[in-house]
Amino acid sequence: LDLVEWANGDPATSKWAKMRADAGHPAPFNLKMIGIGNEDLIDPVFKNRFQQIFDAIKAAYPDIVVVGTVGPAPSGQDYEEGWKYAREAGVPIVDEHSYQSSSWWFHNLDHYDNADRKGPKIYLGEYGSWNTQLINGLSEAAFMGRMELNGDAVVMSSYAPLFAKNGH
């Protein structure tokens, strides 16, 4: 909660917002979303802790959208358990991550074609192909096109190679 207050609070009434202003940014950041979790094992401990944070944010800041997580891969036990939990908890958006071979991207172009349009929306928060050859770029581009076709389910994405340090 302190993070949200630091980002959005009024420096005249909030010690956290005053710290932000004193650090050189007096205007609020207008934070609208916050991610809780990152490639987590979806077990009872995670669910308990996530629920505590989720409930506290929703109570104090009902306009902030909480983005959940569905584990470290686009399939498997954590993925399935993460999706099940997100639906049960009413998480509005989940963050998926996927690093795969070019072959995987081509063979899974339909990955989001049957996504649940009534459940949590999808943020493909990290994705990329495992190499830097032309075929890898083509596979990623093909997958991006299919994400666009499923834009009612996949509402955001972040292409992992764009996170690289400039000049590195």
Predicted regions and their residues:
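Catalytic-core region of carbohydrate-active enzymes that cleave or remodel glycosidic bonds
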Residues: 55-58, 62-65, 83-88, 92-168
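N-terminal catalytic cores of secreted or lumenal carbohydrate-active enzymes
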Residues: 1-64, 68-82, 88-89
